[in-house]
Each structure stands twice: as C-alpha cells, then as structure tokens.
Swiss-Prot record:
Residues 290-330 form the UBA domain. It is found in: Nucleus. This is Serine/threonine protein kinase OSK3. One of its GO terms (cellular component) is nucleus. Residues 17-269 form the Protein kinase domain. One of its GO terms (molecular function) is protein serine kinase activity. The gene is OSK3.
Amino acid sequence: MDGNAKGGGHSEALKNYNLGRTLGIGSFGKVKIAEHKLTGHRVAIKILNRRQMRNMEMEEKAKREIKILRLFIHPHIIRLYEVIYTPTDIYVVMEYCKFGELFDYIVEKGRLQEDEARRIFQQIISGVEYCHRNMVVHRDLKPENLLLDSKYNVKLADFGLSNVMHDGHFLKTSCGSPNYAAPEVISGKLYAGPEVDVWSCGVILYALLCGTLPFDDENIPNLFKKIKGGIYTLPSHLSALARDLIPRMLVVDPMKRITIREIREHQWFQIRLPRYLAVPPPDTAQQAKMIDEDTLQDVVNLGYGKDHVCESLRNRLQNEATVAYYLLLDNRFRATSGYLGADYQESLERNFNRFASSESASSNTRHYLPGSSDPHASGLRPHYPVERKWALGLQSRAQPREIMIEVLKALQDLNVSWKKNGQYNMKCRWSVGTQATDMLDVNNSFVDDSIIMDNGDVNGRLPAVIKFEIQLYKTRDEKYLLDMQRVTGPQLLFLDFCADFLTKLRVL
C-alpha cells in the first residue's frame, strides 16, 4: 500500500486510506484497493470522474447504485462503507472481495461440483431475495456482477441497472446482458421485476453446473430467438433434482416461472442449506437498531465517544466512527465463521440485549431507534415482516386465459379501445361520450394514434381521454393479479372508470 492516498489529487479526500494497486479501469473511473488506516482492513474504492460520467450520461447509474447500497446490510450483498464527494470525483468505499468475479472462477475451474455450485447458488438466492423484500430488482445478474470474498462467499454487486419497484408500476427498460436476460426483457415488454431476476439466476445456475451458457450465439438475432423460444439442452451429467429445478426457472412465460420462495423450498436447494440461510434476515429498520457491543467497544477504544457512535449508527449516519464500526464488524465475523450469517445475527441480538440492559440501568440514554419498542418488552427478536406485495389490484384464482377473456369482454362493454403488447399486457384508451368503435378496426386496435387527445380537456374538440395499461401476473400464493395503471388523463375520471370496470368483472 502507498504510504498515503497519493496521486491524482486524491490525498485530501482519501486521507483516511492508504491507496494501493488498481483493481480495474472502466470508461469513467477506476477501482483501487486501499487500506483503512484506523482499522488496518482492506477496502475497494471506486473513483468516479464526474465530468466523464456527465459526458456518458452515467450519473443516474452511479446515484442508483449508491442509493441502493446505502440501504442494504446483507452477508451476500457488497457492503458500502462511505461515499466521499469532491467537485471532480466521487469516491465509493466498498467491501473488498479478494477473489474477484465469479465469472473468472467459472472460467478457471469449468463446471463445478454440485455441492459447490449449490453453496454458491444458495448465497445468490439469499441476496436476491433480500433485494426483492426491499422492493429492488437487480436486472443485471450475471457472474461478472457476483464477487467472491476471501472465503469464496458470494457478494451481489453492480446495482447500477437496478430499479426500485413501486406498487402497481411495471418496469419497461430493457437492460442487462443479453445472455442472462429474460425473454420479456429483450422483447421490450412490461414486467413486474422479480421474475426477471429468477430467469437470470436460472442461467447462472446452469453456468455453475455446466460450465457453459444455456443460451449462446455470436449472432444476436439468433441468440434472441433461442431465448424467446426457451431453446436449450440439459447435459446428461446433471442430477435429477437439478434437471427439475433449472427448467422451472427458465420458463419463457414469466407468469408460470418459479418464484424465489418456490426455489427456496425446492428439494435440490434445501440440501445442506446453512442455518443462517434457512430464515429471512431482519428488515433494514431492525438491522439499524442492532449494535454489537464488542465492536462498539473496539470503536470507543479508537478514541470515539460511545454516545456519538451509537447515535450515528442508529441514524445511519456516515462518519469516521461508523465506517470503522462496520469494517471491524464485518471482518470480525468473516474471520470467525466465514459467513456473516446466523452467528452474526445471533451475536448481534445477544450483544445488543446485553448492551441495552446495561445501558438502561446506568444511563438515561437508550441506544435504539426512536419510536421503536422497549428492548426489554420485545426481547429484541427480529421482526420478520410479511412480504410486501408487488402491486395492488384484482386477484383471482381463475386461469389466465379465463381472466383475460373476461377482461376483454368488460373492455368491450365499456367501449374501451386496446392494443395488445403481449399475451397478458395491453395498452388501453377510454373516451368519455364517444363510441370507441369510431376509432377501432375490427380487432379493437387503434386506427390512428393522433386523433386522441391526452390532456383530458372536456371543452376541447375531442372528449376527455384516459390512457391506461393492464397487466396480469402471477402472485406468490398461486393467484393471478390484474393490475391497472393510469398513464394520462384525469385521475378522478380514471377512478370512476375503474369502478365501472370492476363491476363488469364481478364474475371473477
């Protein structure tokens, strides 16, 4: 390591680190290894040039990754320690992964033994599930974005293409690597999000077990054809359980694709499942409350005030004390158990119980988040919330085809014009006081997009118009959910229409 953060004008911004060699160079920055002076632990620092990012229109990508990683605390998601901003650069201080990309590991070793592939896959699914629980879909899962630490444990990285999911909102951006992208993504269709990551995980599992990709072709149109058709072969060396799981993940129809929950319950996945992966992690709010007493004392020994450290941790502040705390915490459990898993979780709870108890007896300062329940009353057991639903809408146990038939009947009765984007997705328009047949061909498709106004001006030449989208998708409890989202037009008018539409669908 360099004695100081020398070169390139980084010395003042990175005064707490000794910069080392360059790990990688990108189009708008580089990644360097560094040593945190206070703790002696290694980190990776992304150095992003602001001007180059602006020129390449990549600022949003960087902001998105920082926003997501600030939120996440998970053993199989790369840890963000701090972000340092200067007028010319952004320095993102992250967890250092000694053995680099999973991609290079697969290239070096070829296909993995099933037990090793399963261990890696279990960790990937754990990280992906955590993302989905926090309403984030990665959208670019591939071995190049999965890093290996010093114990060959997986860390999800590169959240630059990720989207934060909102209830009732479907993602439309086609992104990610074609070989790992789901059919609905490369087709440009709307998609809810979670099922896209499931497909990518299926491709990764295939690569782990086979050493090759299920969908590969130098000719991009041919590659897309294979992906859209789900055309691939399973090698004969795969076990029966693996041969059952992979095809269930690589289902072309996203509504029929296996879910993360079902993957976790699959017999192949359950074999030698580590204890810490058998239960969901606490949510991010609960994690912020947990303070490890031993690590806290280590930080206090470095010269920081106890109350200052606790206040910073519970409010998720970034400063020298919290950076030191998380570096010490991560390295303590990595060194003792090899996982930041059950031992990590149980130790945090145990130490926080002990810490909270002693503090309440000796001080009026309580080291847990304002508004949270008293730790003595709650026992400090982590609260595992019921999984949030991706959208609110009309749920039904009827078959998808039956649902769509009833939807089309209702739309026709209400004089709605529509255009199908896919088997379970359509764009719709509804005009007040105008017969929809005036604007439709015999297939209820739009004749001329330009003749419909979008501003809902009832005093204008044309009547008010509502544009909306309808999507049907599968929920985790084996139901189907019909979601409607307004695109343009008066909100109250749209609500009136929804009421009439739901009345028409009473048969469901």
